[in-house]
Regions:
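C-terminal anion-handling pockets and recognition modules
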Residues: 114-180
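Acidic/histidine-rich, metal-coordinating catalytic segments
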Residues: 1, 73-87, 112
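Short, aromatic/basic amphipathic alpha-helical patches
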Residues: 88-98
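RNase H-like two-metal-ion nuclease catalytic core shared by retroviral integrases
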Residues: 80-82, 102-126
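Short catalytic/ligand-binding loop motif for oxyanion handling, primarily in non-cytosolic enzymes
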Residues: 5-8, 86-88, 110-113, 163
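Extended, low-complexity cationic-aromatic segments
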Residues: 1-67, 167, 175
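RNase H-like polynucleotidyl transferase catalytic core
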Residues: 20-28, 96-113
Length: 180
């Protein structure tokens, strides 16, 4: 899942010297945020949905999985990150009924393939216009259709075929001495 702003624009732009770069609009849509949920594989996006209000909780995730994943896929490995809504027993039971569930290692951006996908998706969305929920859905569909399959394979290779192994770093936080 990821948060997507209706005005997904770059933070830097060019303007005349001494003039501020401004995007003018009368629409209140620029302040809206949506929650997107995506299921990806090495062959592309399996399914996705965009919610207008609220984040992804266990009930929404179950609804998405039932509608788009567990009803269509069998004997697949479903990888979820460590969000609390993903670790719910109801989620585990639903996925393990016909598939296998695996949780990603504790958060490391380079081992989480979906985060790399979100970065690619959002950078491409920044180049498109459209403020409304409907237009944003069209833009997402457009961006998804233009991402080559090779990119999806590279995302997974980068996350799961890393030459170096994850090594936990020593903690740098110093223990405060208790003088009193």
């Amino acid at each position: 899942e990821t948060s997507i702003k209706s005005l997904q624009k770059r933070h830097h732009c060019y303007s005349e010297k001494g003039k501020r770069c401004v995007i003018k609009t009368q629409s209140q849509e620029v302040f809206k945020k949506y929650t997107g949920i995506f299921a990806i594989s090495v062959d592309g996006v399996i399914e996705w949905d965009l919610y207008e209000k609220g984040g992804i909780n266990t009930d929404r995730l179950i609804e998405f999985l039932k509608k788009n994943i567990t009803s269509k896929l069998r004997n697949k490995l479903i990888i979820l990150d460590n969000a609390s809504s993903h670790r719910n027993e109801r989620i585990k039971e639903l996925v393990n009924k016909h598939n296998n569930i695996l949780y990603a290692v504790p958060y490391q951006h380079f081992t989480n393939s979906i985060e790399n996908y979100f970065s690619m998706l959002k950078s491409r969305l920044q180049k498109l216009d459209g403020l409304t929920h409907i237009k944003l859905k069209e833009n997402i569909e457009n961006v998804i259709s233009k991402i080559p399959k090779e990119k999806y394979r590279n995302i997974f290779k980068g996350a799961y075929e890393r030459p170096e192994k994850y090594v936990a770093k020593n903690k740098t936080r110093k223990i405060k001495k208790n003088y009193l």
